[in-house]
Amino acid sequence: MVRKEVPVSNRTLQWKCVESKADSKRLYYGRFVLSPLMKGQADTIGTAMRRSLLGEIEGTCITCAKSERVPHEYSTIVGIEESVHEILMNLKEIIVRSDLYGTRDAFICVRGPKYVTAQDIISPPSVKIVDTTQHIASITEPINFCIGLEIERNRGYRTRTTNQDASYPIDAVSMPVRNANYSIQCYGNENEKQEILFLEIWTNGSLTPKEALYEASRNLIDLFIPFLHAEERDLHLDDDQNIFTAPFFPFHEGLAYIGIGESKKRIALKRIFIDQLELSPRTYNCLKRSNIHTLLDLLSKSQEDLRKIQHFRVEDVKRVLDILKKRFAMNLFT
């Protein structure tokens, strides 16, 4: 455990990690302080950070298991104590760390009698098992136990789909932050009250609380970047006076208006993230798994490239093209 004194400054806004500990391989704790803040600012920041920590942080987990020997999910295998369903639930609990998007293949192939743990998972170098002692199955007889696994990086909770080709999808929970809380302490006199924000973060070990804080902060910054380049010309209301219509402008014209030259347009494109394009969750996840994170990444692909993305439908391609045309006056090569 690491403890530090909390400095209270009346001048420069500062943050510190005042407590950091690992209760186990699957439970990390961090306590952070931000001060000095004006009255009301601590609650604003605390609320936004907590929502970002719990809902926006991406994680990696096992999403599917494959075995041709298994007739259905609720069957049992001779020589193994656990049912297939129990094995799937154990795989769901395995904590995995990976910074890469897309599907990664892994497998388990052992011979009993054996106590199978996460250590027996053979995975690519880009995937790390956080706790190799996590239990998967108990083999009581001299039989072979071989299953294939799919590992994906995503965020939030995703329900499984119907199994195909001897595959058994797992309800994926890509939420590395287990909990996040904040508290506020006020100080100073009535005329000049200031606040200290205390932020507590618990993670599952796939990333540290400090890493989670960094990622949550970056996600919030990405959400607010469009407001820094807001187009304010010719704003108008329709006849209804209740419906606000933002003016349309070609993307390159908008870049010129905010003072961005040709040489810097790539930087501007890189600062527009695909989560700002109002895509459906399904389309967004497919693009993210293909390492398409920004508008620049998207424009580097052709329509044919999008059609080749796993689970990406023709209507998804049409939706992306429609957004690019209406919002940016752009298109993709066929």
Curated annotation (Swiss-Prot):
HAMAP family reported for this sequence: RNApol_bact_RpoA
Matches recorded under Pfam families: RNA_pol_A_bac (PF01000), RNA_pol_A_CTD (PF03118), RNA_pol_L (PF01193)
GO cellular component, one term: chloroplast
Record's subunit section: In plastids the minimal PEP RNA polymerase catalytic core is composed of four subunits: alpha, beta, beta', and beta''. When a (nuclear-encoded) sigma factor is associated with the core the holoenzyme is formed, which can initiate transcription.
Protein name per UniProt: DNA-directed RNA polymerase subunit alpha
Residues spanning the signal sequence: none
NCBIfam families associated with the record: rpoA
